[in-house]
């Protein structure tokens, strides 16, 4: 498993333009164990990454404040992940014992029933008065199986008023 990232503040000499990129890769069976009591979870949640194991993920973020009261934030997350298929353990489910795998070798990241997901988000905030914000966001999520058998796309548009609260980012 690895995680690499970089952040560039005031990118290209443009004040208040911040760029961030990240890449995560976890091989099959990485956080699983021979039983669910000793795997890498806490309260049935993965400790290392919400995707568990058997995935490759790329993340890009842009945060820009063009004017003192305006903020623009964009994020794109793309990942592919191998899911278990027809009772065969391909290492994507960390709650499944690694002893149930079919072989000891030959597993690749994304192996099994491969899915590809793209999650894109655009948020715009305007500070009307001190600590009073108007927020607009548009989010698109595309989820599809690599073999083209099934897909699920969703679009979410939100608008809100925020008073004296920090903006929360939900990466899902």
Which residue stretches match the model-derived regions?
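Exposed, low-structure sequence patches enriched in small/polar residues
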Residues: 1-172
């Amino acid at each position: 498993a690895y995680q690499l990232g970089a952040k560039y503040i005031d990118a290209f000499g443009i004040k208040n333009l911040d760029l961030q990129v990240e890449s995560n890769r976890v091989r099959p069976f990485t956080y699983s164990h021979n039983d669910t009591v000793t795997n890498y979870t806490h309260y049935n949640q993965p400790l290392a990454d919400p995707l568990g194991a058997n995935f490759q993920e790329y993340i890009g973020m842009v945060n820009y404040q063009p004017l003192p009261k305006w903020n623009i934030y964009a994020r794109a997350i793309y990942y592919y992940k191998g899911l278990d298929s027809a009772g065969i353990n391909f290492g994507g489910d960390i709650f499944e014992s690694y002893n149930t795998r079919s072989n000891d070798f030959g597993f690749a990241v994304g192996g099994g029933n491969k899915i590809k997901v793209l999650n894109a988000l655009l948020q715009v905030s305007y500070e009307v008065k001190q600590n009073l914000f108007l927020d607009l966001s548009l989010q698109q999520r595309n989820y599809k199986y690599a073999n083209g058998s099934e897909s699920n796309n969703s679009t979410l548009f939100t608008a809100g008023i925020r008073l004296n609260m920090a903006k929360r980012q939900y990466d899902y």
